[in-house]
């Protein structure tokens, strides 16, 4: 049987260039920072476009990865400018986008099919509203599941 599991990646939030540098100094393989206007960490994100470009260049020069987070549930007003706002970020060549909204994921897949997308821990789906297999957004990486399950563990059969 062939394993599809990759080696674990130590991923840390950047928030600032200083924090990014600390994360790498202490062993992080990758960092993430939010895209301005499209990230839930608006208050903890000092990354404007200039700092994103610098952070991506520094990370990749060290053989590290830099992911840009796009994890909002957008209002229609933000949808109108999303691809235009994303274009300069894509030109910076981040290693992947971390996304949560299925509609935005499908939009990126349609217009930027080669851009790697990792699924955010904020992503969710209501079972009866899941897209069909042919319309399902695809992601190249999935986060470990955050789950508190109501089932009691069962004892292994002896």
Pin down the residues of each PLM region.
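Non-catalytic helical/linker scaffolds that mediate oligomerization, partner binding
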Residues: 1-158
